[in-house]
Amino acid sequence: MEEIVLLFAIVSLARSDQICIGYHANNSTKQVDTIMEKNVTVTHAQDILEKTHNGKLCSLNGVKPLILRDCSVAGWLLGNPMCDEFLNVPEWSYIVEKDNPVNGLCYPGDFNDYEELKHLLSCTKHFEKIRIIPRDSWPNHEASLGVSSACPYNGRSSFFRNVVWLIKKDNAYPTIKRSYNNTNKEDLLILWGIHHPNDAAEQTKLYQNPTTYVSVGTSTLNQRSIPKIATRPKLNGQSGRMEFFWTILKPSDTINFESNGNFIAPEYAYKIVKKGDSAIMKSGLEYGNCNTKCQTPIGAINSSMPFHNIHPLTIGECPKYVKSDRLVLATGLRNTPQRKRKKRGLFGAIAGFIEGGWQGMVDGWYGYHHSNEQGSGYAADKESTQKAIDGITNKVNSIIDKMNTQFEAVGKEFNNLERRIENLNKILEDGFLDVWTYNAELLVLMENERTLDFHEANVKSLYDKVRLQLKDNARELGNGCFEFYHKCDNECMESIRNGTYNYPQYSEEARLNREEISGIKLESMGIYQILSIYSTVASSLALAIMIAGLSFWMCSNGSLQCRICI
C-alpha cells in the first residue's frame, strides 16, 4: 500500500507545473575568439574587418581625383608637351601618379626640393594658373629659340610650356633684372630653372657670356646659382642638364630675378586658390566613375567597419588599417542548442547551470518556458533583451566611431640623400602598424569576453528575479527550472514574468503540498530501511547454508578432511 502511495506521489510531482529561464539559440555557426577561448560558437556576431575593395579610383566625397596618367608631378607643373591635357585642371580631391611615369623632366636634370613640393600638394586642392611674365616681354633675348629635341611635340622640338628658356640675341645676353609683385590674395607657386651646359663651347654658343649666374630673392629667399659646366653622358640625346627650383610667394611680397645667362624664366605661376587635405597617391588604376569616402591605391573602400586590411596607404574617412586576417565581434550569446549540447567553456554553461539554449524562442535573447495544465510555451523577456541589444549596439558603434580617422597617412617621399631617414620612417610605420594590429586584436578579444559574460549575467539576473518571487512556493531543479508546489495557470505564469507574482496567495497551497511530499518521502525512507535490513540478513543466511552444505559434501567423499580436537 505504501509503495502505491509513493508511486502516486512521484507521478504527481512529475506532472507539477514548471517555469524555466533560458536563452535564445539558433543554427548559427559563427565563431569568435575571447581572451580565454578560441572558436566559440555564438548566436550573433559582427565582422569588423573590411577585406574588400572595388579595384577602382573614385571621386572622394563627390570631387574627382587628378589622375596624371603617364605624366609626373614635375611634368604637369612645368608643362611637359606630352602633358598638355593638364595645362588647366579643375579642383581635385587627390592626385594620382604612376610609379615611374614616362613624361616627367623631358630635358634631363633635377627638380630641387621635389619631395617638399609634393608635400605642399598634399595640402592643396586647386591651382589657378596665371601668367606673371609674358613670353613676349623679353625684347633683348630670344624667347622662342629655347627648344630641345628631348621635348618633342608633333615631331618637332619643343620645351616646357610654363617656363621660357632664354637664349642670347644678336650675340649678346644683357643682364636680366625682372621683378614680380604678388598682388593676389592667395599664395603663388613660382618655378624657374638654370641650364648646366656640356662644355664651354655650348655655354658661349647659347649665352655668349662665359661666366654667368642666376640670382633670385624674396623676403624669405636669397639664392644665387652658378652653372656647372661638365662633360656628361647623354640622356634623351642631351649632355646638358637643367635644374629647376620653386618657391611660395606670399601676398604683397615681391620676387626679383637677376641673370646674365643660363636662366629659365617663369612665364606662368600657380595661384593656390583652395587648400585642404589631399595627397599624391601612387597607382596605375584608371578612374572608375564612382564615389567613395575612402580611397586606397588598389581600390576604393565603402564600408562602415572600423578596421580594414586592404592597403596601409589611404585617403579619406577610412577604417584603421591593421595586419589582421580576422576580427569578429560577438554580439549574441554562446550558441548551445539543447539538442546538441557542446563542451562547457571556462565558466561552464551559461549562468553556470543552464546547459542548452532554446531554438523555439525567436523573439528575444532571454526568456521563459512554462508548462501547466493549459499547455506550454515560450515567452521572451523583451525588456532585458532590448537593454542588452542597446548596450551592445552602442558598444559596436563606439568602437567604429573611435577607429574612423579622416585623411589617414599616405606614403611619404624622400630624396636620395634621405634614404636613411626613409628606412627609419618605414621601421617606425611598421612598428605603429604592429601596435595598432595588436591593440585591435586585443580589443576584440576583451570585448568578446565581456559580451559573453554580460549575457551570462543577464540570464542569471533573470533567474534570480524569478527565484526571489517564488521563494519556497517552488523548488529549484538545478537546470534553470522551478517546479511549483501549487497550481500555476497562465495568469500565474504571466505574473511571474512581469514581476507581480502574489506569493501569499499561493503559499498555503504550496505549504500543504510540500509537507505531503515530505511526509511521503520520510515514510518511504522507513520502508526502504526495513527492506534493506531484511535483504541483508536473508542474503547472509543463505550464504552460510551454502558454505555448510558444500563442506559436508566434501567431507563425505574424502575431498576434505575434518578433524575435531578437544
From Swiss-Prot:
The keyword Disulfide bond applies. The keyword Metal-binding does not apply. Gene3D superfamilies: 3.90.20.10, 3.90.209.20, Hemagglutinin Chain A, Domain 2. GO terms for molecular function: host cell surface receptor binding. Residues 17-529 are extracellular. A lipid is attached at residues 555, 562, 565 (S-palmitoyl cysteine). Residues 1-16 form the signal peptide. Glycans are attached at residues 26-27, 39, 181, 302, 498. Residues 551-566 are cytoplasmic. Palmitoylated. In natural infection, inactive HA is matured into HA1 and HA2 outside the cell by one or more trypsin-like, arginine-specific endoprotease secreted by the bronchial epithelial cells. One identified protease that may be involved in this process is secreted in lungs by club cells. It is found in: Virion membrane; Host apical cell membrane. The record marks 344-345 as: Cleavage. Disulfide bonds join 20-481, 58-290, 71-83, 106-151, 294-318, 488-492. Major glycoprotein, comprises over 80% of the envelope proteins present in virus particle. The extent of infection into host organism is determined by HA. Influenza viruses bud from the apical surface of polarized epithelial cells (e.g. bronchial epithelial cells) into lumen of lungs and are therefore usually pneumotropic. The reason is that HA is cleaved by tryptase clara which is restricted to lungs. However, HAs of H5 and H7 pantropic avian viruses subtypes can be cleaved by furin and subtilisin-type enzymes, allowing the virus to grow in other organs than lungs. Belongs to the influenza viruses hemagglutinin family. This is Hemagglutinin. It comes from Influenza A virus (strain A/Duck/Ireland/113/1983 H5N8).
